């Protein structure tokens, strides 16, 4: 059964998972997380479970992490690993997972779609050579006996996933898609996340009609966190978000993003004058408005393709891509600039629409932004100051903050 714990940051999701693991010593677990620091925390918090992180430094497994992973699964060992490694599990590994009766714990959203850049001619060569087949826009491997280099990455990925083609009006896109067996092979699955409905793992479950139920977090009198079916614990800080997140209200600086699609990826590509004005605004913000703030307290994030267009003196090396959710390296940063206006890319939307899923782009944008903001010092309980030039993005954050006005924190 898939159980979704959709709770705000700091509600105790990871702590509840640790409690669950420690209270079920007879079960076997695979815990996946965006970053290795969290894997280390799970190992430390569950000493009796003896979690192992698969390694690519072991000679007996040919210095390949996936071979070490396969051996650990076959032995029924508890594993802590990253999202990226998890997405490469092969059918043989999934067979062993079913046999062993593993429980899966997914910490944060897993991207179920990944764009893959490959010429159609290369795919056709592989088809003509009898290595792969194509049916209704889906490519899968039929002959594993390929030892070349030119298509090594393609064959490596086809071991664990299917490649799909999505035809747009002006281009053809290719995507790797997670197989539903990656979820269905486990006895139980816990998904620890926030703003679940805006995330790809939610759409994935809907597409494949995989049933799920919600669980909450209970916080007992001794300070322990546990999964529960009743009303959940809400951390006390949420009632003070208005006092913790200071959103810049500067009409002159905000004017650059008044339009609904201003600061979208397309806007950056087609509006050089606007981009230059935005760069000047960011410089003004850090040079004059926040001029006394140390460089190591600054953090700004946009599309990677916009970095060179927006970089400037005093903040260029404080860049963190807008969709980062897997780092604690910026937890001392207090003065933020978020010059983006996120919309789901065309290929993703076409894939979901093809499967009857209508995505909520506002929820998607909010979930990405909140994860980025929580890379800063607010995760440590400190106040932050943030400049969000896009009106749409800024209002999404303000409405989200307002939504906590009527919430009463629960301690149990």
Stretches found by the model and what they are:
Residues 72-76, 90-102, 184, 295, ...:
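Short basic/glycine-enriched coil/helix segment immediately N-terminal to the Walker B
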Residues 27-38, 189-193, 289, 297-304, ...:
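Conserved RecA-like ASCE P-loop NTPase motor core of nucleic-acid helicases/translocases
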Residues 16-57, 84-85:
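Conserved Walker A/P-loop ATP-binding site and its immediately adjacent core
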Residues 84-86, 94-140, 148-165:
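SF2 helicase catalytic motif II
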Residues 48-89, 303:
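Inter-Walker segment of RecA-like/P-loop motor cores
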Residues 178, 187-188, 194-326, 345, ...:
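Conserved helicase/translocase motor-coupling segment
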Residues 84-89, 112, 314-396, 403, ...:
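Conserved RecA-like P-loop NTPase helicase motor core
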Residues 1-18:
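Walker A/P-loop
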